[in-house]
Amino acid sequence: MKRKLLLMLLCAALGLGAAQVEVYRVENEKDVPADWAEKDTLRLTCIDTNRSDAMVLQSGGEAMMVDSGEGRYRKRVYATLDGYGITELKYLLNTHCDDDHLHGFIYLMYSDLYQVDAFLSPNTTTYVDEEGYHQQAVKATGTKNIPYVQIGDGDELTLGNAKLTIFRCPLPTGQNNRSAACMVQFGDSRAFLTGDIDNETMQWYAATYGEKLRCDILKAPHHGLATIPDSFVEQTQPQVLFVPNRSALSTKVTAGWVKNHMPGAALYFSGDGTATMLTDGTDWYIWQEPNYVDPQ
């Protein structure tokens, strides 16, 4: 049965004009209206990679990924890409170089399974991380002749008819807090992908960007392990919160926390099953698959 989450946004505050965004929670893609097959849409797929980030964006015949999950889950990523018939990725956007965000990209670039047009990172090619994943990624781009592009705060990208805006905190507070966050906008629909920013950076975002953070969909920062401050909730005002983690492992973002701090918001844990979010720029349809079982 289709469940409707009523979402009435004052779009004057967003600068988007008078519009109403509605979010529908459905059992599966079969519940999406048939005429949507002919529409120009944006699809956000949050792959079940346990407690790691791996997201696929598709719009206008183009596809990209934001983070890749741990390398051991790469076959789940490939199965998702292959299921969509994706053979080319316009961008591999790495928010920061922790293994649970970057390791899978290293495998993907060496796999030769997909054409990769560019690897995007907030770090320079000479940046050194202690675990060495960034250096491995830089080496892979050179070996496979993949353009390496450093991205920074305020940069804009396009994917089909979607616009992506990069947000990044300049404070020297560690690579998690300096993750390259990404606001994805398609028509009046907005999804904010936050990397691993923590409480301190969320407060800085709220004070610095204010209403620019408004979104319908929010990726819970740092796998639900970070306390989300009220100021960040006030500026983002999401109707859907998804956590790239298993519900049993998310210590800060829980059903009880959402009930108290984001009443009415829907909560998904993509570590409990891949979550897919589809929009035509006005409405969202969201569904979740069962927990992924790796083939034997």
Can you name each region flagged by the protein language model?
Residues 6-15, 263:
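Hydrophobic helical h-region of N-terminal Sec-dependent signal peptides
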Residues 1-5:
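Positively charged n-region of N-terminal signal peptides that target proteins for export
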Residues 102-114, 128-138, 230-234, 252-256:
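Metal-dependent catalytic neighborhoods of phosphoester/phosphodiester hydrolases
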Residues 147-152, 267-271:
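Short acidic-hydrophobic, aromatic-tinged amphipathic segments that line or gate anion-handling sites
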Residues 51-53, 71-73, 97-103, 126-129, ...:
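Active-site environment of divalent metal-dependent phosphoester hydrolases
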Residues 182, 241-296:
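Binuclear metal-dependent phosphoesterase catalytic core
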Residues 20-88, 150-214, 275-296:
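Core dinuclear metal-dependent hydrolase active-site scaffold
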Residues 60-64, 72-121, 208-225, 237-241:
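Active-site metal-binding motif and surrounding structural segment of the metallo-beta-lactamase
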